[in-house]
Amino acid sequence: MGTSSDPIQDGSDEQQKRSEIYTYEAPWHIYAMNWSVRRDKKYRLAITSLLEQYPNRVEIVQLDESNGEIRSDPNLSFEHPYPPTKTIFIPDKECQRPDLLATSSDFLRLWRIADDHSRVELKSCLNSNKNSEFCGPLTSFDWNEAEPRRIGTSSTDTTCTIWDIEREAVDTQLIAHDKEVFDIAWGGVGVFASVSADGSVRVFDLRDKEHSTIIYESSEPDTPLVRLGWNKQDPRYMATIIMDSAKVVVLDIRFPALPVVELQRHQASVNAIAWAPHSSCHICTAGDDSQALIWDISSMGQHVEGGLDPILAYTAGAEIEQLQWSSSQPDWVAIAFSTKLQILRV
């Protein structure tokens, strides 16, 4: 990534190396994408298609370090009924559990990758509304890193559903908002937050399901909030994206209502945010201006004349729709734009 001021580690040997970029071209437009977490699967990602026809596709790809090519394995490419809105590998760094991949669309699905990598099988298809032929599409989900049997989903039907994937049963279903819920993020074992078309960020504690705390509301009524990122290294902070807005709002849950900082250097709508998995004060944002920007927000709360500037910037070949920061290799960020997946050393 090109430096726009001081790099994250000033003058370190890592920064002296040329930045590395690897590109994979998919046979279709990429929508959802994510990194594998397992230590034994470095540089492995899942990508999913955005096709109008039925079915869609999921591919698992991996960088071959010997020749610098990202390759797709035909055995690990499979059909998916609708375009997945999100995909996540099981948060299992130490490889103690089955190798699972989850996807959300009409239902939450869990896929098992065979130990010999010969195939991917559907393990579970989880439907929280079995009494109805109609189900509100799932807009997003998050896998609980502290308790990997728990996955939380968000839906257009205003609910958030907490699944126990080992029992394949609903733990809790909450009416979370007044309108569609667009994203959900865990902040600990029993705490999650969600954002909605009603313009609010709400925090829920599973020990007290009757109440939620409104952390933030859009300054203009009913302006949807579409994405939410919770800082894993410092859970006091979260970030959200306002629909069709070029700014990212960073919140401190101790001080509801007022953002601690607004990141305003994108030239078009922001589509994705990712907190650094290894640092409490770095966040990456990406959007329709084809830019991925990394910010150091350690000066939060101090007045910065003219607003905060990013410390790193990368310009892609088209609008960036998806962004993920690797938790197992924190010096790598992945972006997706059009039919291309790129992984970037930061």
Curated annotation (Swiss-Prot):
One of its GO terms (molecular function) is transcription cis-regulatory region binding. Induction: Circadian-regulation. Disruption phenotype: Plants lacking LWD1 do not show obvious phenotypic alterations. Plants lacking both LWD1 and LWD2 are early flowering and this phenotype is more prominent under short-day conditions. Coiled coil: none annotated. InterPro entries: DCAF7-like, WD40/YVTN_repeat-like_dom_sf, WD40_repeat_CS, WD40_repeat_dom_sf, WD40_rpt. GO terms for biological process: anthocyanin-containing compound biosynthetic process; entrainment of circadian clock by photoperiod; photoperiodism, flowering; rhythmic process. Pfam families: WD40. The keyword Coiled coil does not apply. It is found in: Nucleus. Its main location: nucleus. Keywords: Acetylation, Biological rhythms, Nucleus, Repeat, Sensory transduction, WD repeat. WD repeats lie at residues 79-121, 133-173, 176-214, 265-305. GO terms for cellular component: nucleus. The modification N-acetylmethionine is found at M1. SUPFAM superfamilies: WD40 repeat-like. Clock protein essential for the proper expression phase and period length of both the oscillator and output genes known to participate in photoperiod sensing. Required for the expression of APRR9, APRR7, and APRR5. Regulated by APRR9 and APRR7 at the transcriptional level, indicating the existence of a positive feedback loop within the circadian clock. May function to delay the expression of the morning genes until dawn approaches. This is WD repeat-containing protein LWD1. It comes from Arabidopsis thaliana (Mouse-ear cress).
